[in-house]
Amino acid sequence: VQAENPTAQTKRSPSNGALQAAENAARYGRNKAQLRYSFVQRSHPDDPPPPLARMLRGGRGGQVRLKLYLSYLWMQREDTAQGLTFANRAWATLLDLRDPATAGARRIGDAQAWLEENQFIEIVSQMGRPNQVLVLDESGTGQAYVAPGAAARKEAKSVFGAIVHRYVQIPRAFWTSGYLTVLSGAGVAMFLALLCERGPASSDEALWFSPKDAERRFGLSEDTRSKGLRELAEVGLVRTKRRPINPTDFEVVHVRNVHYLDLDRLNETAGIKAAPRRVVRVSKKRTAKEAP
């Protein structure tokens, strides 16, 4: 058996169906989805893993759960939760799942069941219509959902309230340009982590956290961190540079990787290199008659 060189890498792009579904969904969604920091990172190393890590770790289908819940939050235009009544096939198309009318719809149903069991959503059955999904608080405690911007304004005089309701904003182009669909769960997780790290800073701000920080703050493994950063670089959302830690000291210079988010890239349709497949050629065994 002889292994040939890997085939040329092909570009994985969102399907036309997914892009059209995102454009249709944008009529109901916010210009920028709001997501609390507490969904992405824990405030203390001894706290349980944050909801983001729990979704990814919770068995098969983690990335579908994460992408689906983020999409639910995107479509919350009001300050309080608004019920969403769309068929599972529509959500499967938005997430660009295979066979959206059958297998994809079942994957959405499985994700909804997990999200309801873990108190991120409430599902209301409706006779003759798709089930209604009611979003609950990002903490997974079953509390009623209030948009973080509105909650922060309500508790403006409370320092504790301002901290609890700190949030990042995810541009609608994350959906309409197909980035949600082409990134894996690791890629989406690291995008959210970098958004939290960046805060309101400009795109020129250098971002850095160590593998230990990925686990301590975000509950993400080194594999997830490295895979996610690699994907973000491939789609052009992140530029990574090596920067000296002590450039002015008379010591051995140590360097580390720093990352720069480029949110302007969201204005372009997403594309990521698919993993190359190895083509294996099996040599035909000679029979006794064929032998020289």
Sequence positions of predicted segments:
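Eukaryotic partner-binding/assembly regions in large regulatory complexes
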Residues: 1-34, 81-152
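Short boundary/linker motifs that mark transitions into or out of structured domains
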Residues: 35-43
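Short, Lys/Arg-enriched N-terminal segment that forms or immediately precedes the first helix
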Residues: 43-59, 168-180
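Short, low-complexity cationic-aromatic patches
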Residues: 55-65, 83-84, 103-107, 179-187, ...
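Detector for short helical micro-motifs
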Residues: 60-80, 182-202
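Winged helix-turn-helix DNA-binding recognition segment
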Residues: 76-131, 199-255
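Short, amphipathic alpha-helical interaction segments positioned at domain boundaries
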Residues: 137-178, 256-292
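Intrinsic, low-complexity N-terminal interaction/targeting segments
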Residues: 165-168, 185, 204
